[in-house]
């Protein structure tokens, strides 16, 4: 069968199915496995009225027949009424005269009547009431039986639903057609009228001249002509041409998708080749194809504007569409895949723990739609329908990025990174028997790691991909602890001490624990928490310490409870920790804000240390830079932000700004913290 979807209407013909869709399109780049079928156009996408000459002619003919019928009925009624004695007496009364206003005179031959007539819509209740009334007027048993059957039918739920559909279609079919401009040169016509009225001196002519020359009216006529010109330039779409073309496809079910192609609005669809067919491969979120809901993955493209597509590769399709603009008509074979209606997907926010560049990825299905991002970026995942390739927006780019981009799915990224590590380990040289054994065990573990679905011991944290995030605004009375991380001689201790000295009422340090004896000038609970070695070791076993160590046979450490005491006091806890402590801290309920203090360039670092009276050797500077890279690579996923300390005063101001921002703006934190 043939079904045509035009401007929301559905009409049915025979043999083949046809659907018309209004969509739009963006720019195209290079072919990979899929290609985005987008190309530039002159106008923005908009819904255009479909005007079919044959239909319009039939409507005009029906209107003319109805007008003649009404005239004949009117004449008949007039003859009947004229024979009335009462009307003859009324005719003797002289008629009232009024003022003849030529403005409202119509030209000869023009009949002002609406092409659509009001259709009364009956409700089920009206039908039921009418049947009950008829039932009371009928007396024979056969009629009563027939009415009873009809009443049962009217009360049937399926009938009532069908009746509602009938009413809805009736209302829709009787809506007036969109207006079509009579002329596109209203400005010229107004100028001509003003020229004709120049020699005229009577009041009405002067008033009309002033009206037509008013700036607002001139602007209105200009706007009218611009819109009318676009409307009248559209070539009326002829269904006959399309029906002739689809006849060659025999009994195959086809559909027509109508698109108004634009230069700057993306279509959001990709195509691929299957043998000699061109198949819609992917519908991208945010595009006109996805919003219309009428273009589907798996549809085969047969024709575009009467040009046969079968046998062309995706590059030829791109070249073809590049030269087309305006209204495009696609003839498609619908996909045979039966898919459940897509559920409304919840947007998931994730933090990326790796860098991604689609131009360097041989696996991305459509390189033009690949979304690049850097470690630490927030991504808004809006579709996981394809588990290997998610559709996402990058934080801050939603307004500038009309189409969602493709990013690797979590499992897919983990598996290929595991395989990549396995291949790299296979290439490592074997140096000694002992190293060979260690390498062999590691390699074996990684190979098991690759099969993530079958490995119960699989550690997701070992291969970092994404971390689900949520927005969190810290309460005024419960501040997040500030953690400063960085290699030695990068200034984190100096920055921490400056904050403590300048704003003592706002910042505080956690009181550490120790097993050494208290000295005379020390106060328990202020300088240290003095505990026995046995108690200290028990707390270590219980995981109560963020970090701990041994110095001169005495244990020292910072506990989670010590940090919590500062938070409960309403102050901001300042800590300078080693990277080994970050995992324990992040797994606690303290919600830390971790700032990485990074060194500047090697030359700038030498100058800064020289100001402090230090004269480091070149190898020491290289070691600091290398340590920085190592910390970023191994622990960068824990960092909330970073400060490059090229000047201590500027670094201090930036640190203070970031801390103050926690009070005014919500921050992205792991979703697990808020559960």
From Swiss-Prot:
The gene is PALS1. Transmembrane segments: none annotated. Residues 256-336 form the PDZ domain. This is Protein PALS1. It is found in: Golgi apparatus; Cell membrane; Endomembrane system; Cell junction, Tight junction. Residues 10-36, 54-78 have a biased composition (Basic and acidic residues). The lineage of its organism: Eukaryota, Metazoa, Chordata, Craniata, Vertebrata. GO terms for biological process: central nervous system neuron development; cerebral cortex development; establishment or maintenance of epithelial cell apical/basal polarity; establishment or maintenance of polarity of embryonic epithelium; generation of neurons; morphogenesis of an epithelial sheet; protein localization to plasma membrane; regulation of transforming growth factor beta receptor signaling pathway. Heterodimer with MPP1. Forms a heterotrimeric complex composed of PALS1, LIN7B and PATJ; the N-terminal L27 domain of PALS1 interacts with the L27 domain of PATJ and the C-terminal L27 domain of PALS1 interacts with the L27 domain of LIN7B. Component of a complex composed of PALS1, CRB1 and MPP4. Component of a complex whose core is composed of ARHGAP17, AMOT, PALS1, PATJ and PARD3/PAR3. Component of a complex composed of PALS1, CRB1 and EPB41L5. Within the complex, interacts (via HOOK domain) with EPB41L5 (via FERM domain), and interacts with CRB1 (via intracellular domain). Keywords: ATP-binding, Cell junction, Cell membrane, Cell projection, Golgi apparatus, Membrane, Nucleotide-binding, Phosphoprotein, Repeat, SH3 domain, Tight junction. The L27 domain 1 functions in targeting to the tight junctions by binding to and stabilizing PATJ. The PDZ domain binds to the C-terminus of SC6A1. The modification Phosphoserine is found at residues 14, 25, 83-84. Residues 1-345 are annotated as: Required for the correct localization of PALS1 and PATJ at cell-cell contacts and the normal formation of tight junctions and adherens junctions. It comes from the Eukaryota.
